[in-house]
Amino acid sequence: MVSWIISRLVVLIFGTLYPAYYSYKAVKSKDIKEYVKWMMYWIIFALFTTAETFTDIFLCWFPFYYELKIAFVAWLLSPYTKGSSLLYRKFVHPTLSSKEKEIDDCLVQAKDRSYDALVHFGKRGLNVAATAAVMAASKGQGALSERLRSFSMQDLTTIRGDGAPAPSGPPPPGTGRSSGKHSQPKMSRSASESAGSSGTA
């Protein structure tokens, strides 16, 4: 049995890269017939890829599932079967032509709703961001005011400590001794003067 990896490689190479190269050649040569052919193929392949997303989940257990996928891609690409052109002309084009107006209306409504939803969620996001910024600013301002208040209280305490008067008390012991020393020469001088005056008399 073919594994998932081999099936995926075959689909990528022959279902995507090979048609992409020939689509490039059709655009380069401006061949309208080839251009239309590959446009029909890409529409069918887009539907196949969409369906494959779900069938890989729910039908991967089916016997020969991956072989059937490879065979389907080969059928789409074969110039003999022209599977993509057949599916497009028989099923896809008539269905899209009959439902085109409804599909366009649904797309317009989806576009408008998605735009409104985007604007709504954008406004809500801006409101939440603004509220968070205001709360952060208020908390930061409160913390800053508390910090400044604590600093001002410390400054007042320091100023009071520097301007306090010196404590009153008895003079230091050295002051009395120095005054005694200074007064002793004065007393001896006055005694000598009195002795001199008495001798003269």
UniProtKB/Swiss-Prot annotation:
Q: Which InterPro entries does the entry link to?
A: TB2_DP1_HVA22
Which PANTHER family does this one have? HVA22-LIKE PROTEINS, RECEPTOR EXPRESSION-ENHANCING PROTEIN 1
Q: Give this protein's Gene Ontology molecular function annotations.
A: microtubule binding
| Swiss-Prot/TrEMBL keywords | Endoplasmic reticulum, Membrane, Mitochondrion, Phosphoprotein, Transmembrane, Transmembrane helix
Q: What is its main location?
A: membrane
**One GO BP annotation here?**
endoplasmic reticulum tubular network organization
According to the UniProt entry, which residues carry Phosphoserine? Answer: S152
> Subunit composition?
Interacts with OLFR992. Interacts with SPAST and ATL1. Interacts (via C-terminus) with microtubules. Interacts with ZFYVE27.
- The answer to whether the entry has keyword Transmembrane is yes
Location in or out of the cell: Membrane; Mitochondrion membrane; Endoplasmic reticulum
Pfam families according to UniProt: TB2_DP1_HVA22
Expressed in which tissues: Detected in olfactory sensory neurons of the olfactory epithelium, and in total brain.
Cellular component GO terms, alphabetical: endoplasmic reticulum; endoplasmic reticulum membrane; endoplasmic reticulum tubular network; membrane; mitochondrial membrane
Q: What is this protein called?
A: Receptor expression-enhancing protein 1
Q: Which family does it belong to?
A: Belongs to the DP1 family.
